[in-house]
Amino acid sequence: MDPRTLSALKDAIRSIPDYPKPGIVFRDITTLLGDPGAFRRAVDALVHPFAGGRIDRVAGIEARGFILGGAVAHQLSSGFVPIRKKGKLPHTTVSIAYALEYGTDEMEIHSDAVKPGDRVVLVDDLIATGGTAEAAVNLLRQIGAEVVAACFVIDLPALGGAARLRALDVPVFTLVEFEGH
């Protein structure tokens, strides 16, 4: 992607200082999603590495990963798989617990969401420490998916999340980077 487009995408993301707590700068993609041109460019860029290849499913992490992942799945003519917080899916599920900054959480997926060997791309809006994305990768692998890559609009490289996924042999594609957390 050319530098002007990357700069335009970065400019389309609102930064909110001291949210949700002092010292944190929240990267709000709702402004990017609300700009039709920026949204289109972001989805096109997320799709680009996989155009012409076989991607069976795109998995999106609740909640912003649903928006981006659904659009990516549509463009790739792939199915979409939601990865949700525990208790939100109506059918038989498989779940995984993962660590948060203060405590733990659980996410789940329908047990029949992918077929063994399905090639899956994981999509979310942002990667920080990588704990949620790592849990999603492990959950997908647990039900037989081949996770071919993980894609994010935003990377906070100082927090090490992309490196954490690469250590699991998952290629990571991100569009823009922001310093700090």
Curated annotation (Swiss-Prot):
EC number(s) from the headed UniProt entry: 2.4.2.7
Molecular function GO terms recorded: adenine binding; adenine phosphoribosyltransferase activity; AMP binding
Organism, scientific name: Methylobacterium sp. (strain 4-46)
This protein's name: Adenine phosphoribosyltransferase
Highest taxon in the source lineage: Bacteria
Residue ranges crossing the lipid bilayer per the database entry: none
Pathway given in the UniProt record: Purine metabolism; AMP biosynthesis via salvage pathway; AMP from adenine: step 1/1
Alphabetical list of InterPro entries matching this protein: Ade_phspho_trans (IPR005764), PRibTrfase_dom (IPR000836), PRTase-like (IPR029057), UPRTase/APRTase (IPR050054)
Enzyme category, top tier: transferase
Signal sequence residues: none
Any single biological process term in GO: AMP salvage
GO CC, one annotated term: cytoplasm
Family in the record: Belongs to the purine/pyrimidine phosphoribosyltransferase family.
PROSITE patterns recorded: PUR_PYR_PR_TRANSFER
Record's subcellular location: Cytoplasm
